[in-house]
Amino acid sequence: MNNSEQFLSPRMGRVEQIHFVGIGGAGMCGIAEVLHNQGYRITGSDLGESGTVQRLRSLGIQVYIGHRLENIKGADVVVRSSAVDFNNPEIVAARELMIPVIPRAAMLAELMRFRHGIAIAGTHGKTTTTSLVSSLLAEGGLDPSFVIGGKLNSCGANAQLGKSAYFVVEADESDASFLFLKPMMAVVTNIDADHMDTYEGDFEKLRTTFLEFLHHLPFYGLAVVCLEDEEICRILPAIQRPTLTYGFKEEAHYRAINWTQKGMLSEFVVVRPAPHKQLTIQFQYPGRHNVLNALASIAIATELGVDDDSIVRGLQKFQGVGRRFQMLGEKQFEKGAAIIVDDYGHHPQEILSTIDAFRRVWPERRLVHVFQPHRYTRTQSLHRQFVDVLSLSDELLLMDIYAAGETAIPGVTSENLANEIRSRDKRVTIVSEQSLKATLDEFIKDGDVILMQGAGSIGQIAVNLMKNM
């Protein structure tokens, strides 16, 4: 394939207008943007205004606030977010009018169908790894299209339509919708207990679903998997596709050695399979988990023929992803100034990785941790792990659980979580958005770092705290 040639995707039959229900979602907006750039008429609806909605409008996409049956007028197909139920008035109207209604992942699979798809899966690290792969391929002149579940800071967008056939996507296991995808290459970063309601509480079912995802690769495709993850090691012998591994272990095909962390700067050497030479990598993204994410991207880039200088340069230039250990700046409080870091982590393992990275970057500073639990089901099923990891913070401020559309579960509250952490002689303060600034004025000492963490509204709360409060 000549990567300098414009790749033209075949049109989807008679489809001209596509309507997205829940267009502001992280997994939806990028697909809508790519289709808009391909020349389709795109409309969408969402429950409220947001920066994402404003960006889509700036591109010329019609976005309605609120869900009403008249919003789907003219649509040839309706794309449904997994967060939207089947009783939504737009979904009901589309079915009555016999307009096809498809899940988000089915449209993503359609975009990928005629391309060289590279799908990044895993319970943790998907967004960062997808961003890294996209960045390295772009730096190497491959001009990929990409759809990411977060905003790539270098371009301020979740998605981009490139000229080549390469298409990098984040593959979502939360509703098992990654099984719609049939990529040419796939990465699995790890397999951990999350979204277990999708898998009927059966971890073996989760594990085998990841294996099934890898077997959607063609027999000549490539699986790239992390050798540091225990569950991946369990399924490794059963993967019946060409496979490469990455990690710190000596037997990994792509191995990191001599890793050091100096402030935000990670430096390590990557040992690659012959005939590829070792590379010295400098990378402004802290933590062991991000070294692993970088290794996955190096493996994909190397296997696709990206030159060594572009790999090294691409990692040096990488500006990160929105809400992934994102430094918002320094803010003055009544008793001193503190750095504010915004992070999307919402699973105990993600929180642990973030705290570990924090301790490496700022070993002498105090961690003031503002955490918003996300979903009642997750808080309930991982209660013990949340207690263990949140007890590691120096000061913990807990917000109410962000429901994300779930019904409250009796006894599953932030207060109950706080009480168990307090039983370990840890101070925990329950805060709301309204009381947060006053509480921080009371707690913050000069030189502290505030970690605002969670997958709900806390991201916007962090921005508001930085700007206005």
UniProtKB/Swiss-Prot annotation:
Leading EC class: ligase
Binding residue positions for ATP: 122-128
Record localization: Cytoplasm
Entry GO terms, CC: cytoplasm
Main subcellular location: cytoplasm
Pathway(s) of this molecule: Cell wall biogenesis; peptidoglycan biosynthesis
InterPro entries hit by this protein: Mur-like_cat_sf (IPR036565), Mur_ligase_C (IPR004101), Mur_ligase_C_dom_sf (IPR036615), Mur_ligase_cen (IPR013221), Mur_ligase_N (IPR000713), MurCDEF_pg_biosynth (IPR050061), UDP-N-AcMur_Ala_ligase_MurC (IPR005758)
Reactions performed catalytically: UDP-N-acetyl-alpha-D-muramate + L-alanine + ATP = UDP-N-acetyl-alpha-D-muramoyl-L-alanine + ADP + phosphate + H(+)
Keyword Magnesium set for record: no
Enzyme Commission no: 6.3.2.8
Pfam families the UniProt entry points to: Mur_ligase, Mur_ligase_C, Mur_ligase_M
Keyword Cell wall biogenesis/degradation appears in the UniProt entry: yes
Keyword list, A-Z: ATP-binding, Cell cycle, Cell division, Cell shape, Cell wall biogenesis/degradation, Cytoplasm, Ligase, Nucleotide-binding, Peptidoglycan synthesis
GO molecular function, one term: UDP-N-acetylmuramate-L-alanine ligase activity
GO terms under biological process: cell division; cell wall organization; peptidoglycan biosynthetic process; regulation of cell shape
UniProt-listed PANTHER family: UDP-N-ACETYLMURAMATE--L-ALANINE LIGASE, UDP-N-ACETYLMURAMATE--L-ALANINE LIGASE-RELATED
Family: Belongs to the MurCDEF family.
Function in brief: Cell wall formation.
Protein name (record): UDP-N-acetylmuramate--L-alanine ligase
Source organism of this protein record: Legionella pneumophila subsp. pneumophila (strain Philadelphia 1 / ATCC 33152 / DSM 7513)
Gene behind the chain: murC
